[in-house]
Amino acid sequence: MAFLKKSLFLVLFLGLVSLSVCEEEKRESEEEKNEQEEDDRDERSEEKRLLGMIPLAISAISALSKLG
């Protein structure tokens, strides 16, 4: 009977350890995913900002060409 208790305790302990490791890996992968999404969002906002400046640049160039 004592052997069964020890075996059961060992199985439960190893199960908890593996569950803890899996949860930690899952948490890390979610953090990496969130960081990746934030980086993508930042890149898109920079692209939009630059695209918004194109009409201004075109109008400035045309104004300069009219002067010269």
Swiss-Prot record:
Residues 1-22 form the signal peptide. Its main location: secreted. GO terms for biological process: defense response to bacterium; defense response to fungus; innate immune response; killing of cells of another organism. Residues 24-46 are annotated as: Disordered. GO terms for cellular component: extracellular region. Keywords: Amidation, Amphibian defense peptide, Antibiotic, Antimicrobial, Cleavage on pair of basic residues, Fungicide, Immunity, Innate immunity, Secreted, Signal. Expressed by the skin glands. The modification Leucine amide is found at L67. Residues 31-41 have a biased composition (Acidic residues). Residues 23-49 form a propeptide. It is found in: Secreted. Belongs to the frog skin active peptide (FSAP) family. Medusin subfamily. Antimicrobial peptide active against Gram-positive bacteria and fungi but inactive against Gram-negative bacteria. Also inhibits growth of B.dendrobatidis zoospores at high concentrations. Shows anticancer activities. Shows hemolytic activity. The primary structure of this peptide is identical to that of Phylloseptin-L1 (AC P0DQK9) and of medusin-AS (AC L0P329). This is Medusin-AS. It comes from Agalychnis spurrelli (Gliding leaf frog).
